[in-house]
Amino acid sequence: MAEEKKRRPRRSKANLIECINNAAEEQIKKDGFSNILVTDIIKRAKIEPVVFYKRYHNLETFLSEFVKNYDYWFSDVLKDLKSPVTSKEGMTEIFQRLIVELNKDSVMLELLRWEVAIGNSTTSRTAMLREIHIMPLVKDFEVLFHDKNVDIAALTALIIGGVYYLSLHKDRSPFSGIDINTPEGMCRIQKAIQYFVKKIYEENKLHDDRKLIAYRLKEAGVSENVIEQCVWGRK
């Protein structure tokens, strides 16, 4: 009598979902969101097709659920900072940590790539949710730099956008002669972030110093016109 085929141990619903998600994560890191196939996920997860389709109507439905695991990704970058978020050191650490995390060939990097390449309900939602999660931080910085001649929202957009592009471009060619795949290249970008943030905060302090000088000159009886010209450089 032929031996009965050994059955695989029955897995719980939570375990199956975890297996499917882990398989998708590995496949996405390898091929990206645009090239992923259900058959690849099934093969990696070592499940039957019926198990996948019992839970997800199609690949689009699965990906819509899967990317929700990354809705709070930017918020996670802000966790356990060594310095207050709105301090010079805090801002520096946020942007430096951002490029380090993206440089790990993460699913998040592939999600950014997918958002740029493909417009659909899922990519629109993930991009908008990230914007919503970033805005409280931007608002905190805007309060700090209020009336300081510094458009901090625009400056942080340039830094974050630059970090995103450098990360997305890193496997195509160096950028401005800098290869962030190398320790030397990454170090140069980290130092540039530190320098850029330092200048932003120096401008903030300079504005406060000028206000104090203007106030003292006014108290000393110096005319408004002279103060405007000498302190603020206005004609």
Named regions from a protein language model:
Residues 1-14, 207, 221:
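N-terminal intrinsically disordered/low-complexity leader segments
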Residues 13-25, 41, 66-70, 74:
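Generic hydrophobic, amphipathic alpha-helix propensity
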Residues 19, 27-61, 65:
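Helix-turn-helix
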Residues 45-49, 223, 234:
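Short coil turns linking two alpha-helices in DNA-binding domains
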Residues 65, 79-104, 108, 147-156:
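Hydrophobic alpha-helical connector segments
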Residues 74-78, 120-146, 153-154, 187-191:
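Amphipathic alpha-helical packing segments from all-alpha helical-bundle domains
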Residues 102-124, 169-176:
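Amphipathic alpha-helical segments used for helix-helix packing
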